Amino acid sequence: MRAAYACDPMATRGRAVVEEESAHRSPFQRDRDRIIHSSAFRRLKHKTQVFVEHEGDYFRTRLTHSLEVAQVARTMARALGLDEDLTETVALAHDLGHPPFGHTGEDALSALMAPYGGYDHNAQALRIVTHLERHYAEFDGLNLTWETLEGIAKHNGPVAAPLPWALEASCADINLELSTHASAEAQVAALADDIAYNHHDLHDGLRAELFSTDELAGLPILKGCFAAVDQRYPGLNYYRRRHEALRRFFGVLVEDVLANARAALAEINPQSAMDIRNAGRPIIRFSNGLFADLQVIRTFLFKRMYRAPSVVEMRTQVTQVVEDLFPFFLETPSELPRQWRKDVEDVAGDATQLARIVSDYISGMTDRFALQCHQRLIGGAQDGTVTGPSTLNFGA
């Protein structure tokens, strides 16, 4: 049953280009389908978060992460009486703007773009769905509903000035009310993202042998999860014990968000989606106690996983790839693909616009393509050793 504070697909604020409605799908379902069928979504298969693609097929990619986020987001939306399709849509779209090599790639591209308006993956996601996807006859982008665009832009909360240039450009023709909070559906998608990455970073870190289950069993929340498993399944083998404990950890996070959200909703008694946006605070969030426990876990992961020697070495290598490719294309835009060269011709002589085109191009690369592009354009041998301003070995 749809709650009074849920977004109503039949009362959407519409699309930038008016289209005939579908007889079989709601506006939010059409948004979801357009995202799934987009080029940017397919490329997430070969974009990673912590481990570069070649390090193993087992580790999460942006695509598998987005699917996990969508699954838990939809479940929580159903429990809270929200529109499941809008929630799923924002969840599937939330990582579209990430460049290759995860947060390392974004850090590198952000530094390079600082003189030209900066780089932000949420703003880039909005740019992708409003401009860079060019497949439809009547419009650039995907022509998504206002509610989906709002969710992409501010699922993490209100956006204050100065705005990233990509967000400012995308919002030039549509007012997404950036000073307010997003819908409850978008807020659920944001918390689902937090739940998914906290869970799978622990899982991937164990798989990479960066820490042990004994170490995890001493951390907040996880201590109770392992104890519950040991009590119910004494003598359980290592892999099943690990899985059961992390499964319980996942459940604890979901239940905390739902309980906290129900309490907040009871307090403010919202009667419309606008009441959620104008509440002045996020309605969907972790409880203070659990959030503090998660900070302890994130500190542990930062030290033991994100700053592990093997990961730091990888970060240095892939940072160099982005730092090499960006000036190369600035100086040699003729090496861009044909469709991108047309954009360069349209901004002839404008250094800032050229940099933004190069940024758009690099941010759309997958890990694999960026490495291959670097090897082909900057230099490298068939054995995987990439040469140029630095010597990088990406191995097998």
UniProtKB/Swiss-Prot annotation:
Protein name per Swiss-Prot or TrEMBL: Deoxyguanosinetriphosphate triphosphohydrolase-like protein
PANTHER family: DEOXYGUANOSINETRIPHOSPHATE TRIPHOSPHOHYDROLASE-LIKE PROTEIN, DEOXYNUCLEOSIDE TRIPHOSPHATE TRIPHOSPHOHYDROLASE
Homology family: Belongs to the dGTPase family. Type 2 subfamily.
SMART domains reported for this sequence: HDc (SM00471)
Gene Ontology MF, one: dGTPase activity
NCBIfam families tied to this protein: dGTP_triPase (TIGR01353), PRK01286.1-1 (NF002326), PRK01286.1-3 (NF002328)
Origin: domain of life: Bacteria
Record-level GO BP terms: dGTP catabolic process
Pfam families assigned to the protein according to its UniProt record, in alphabetical order: HD (PF01966), HD_assoc (PF13286)
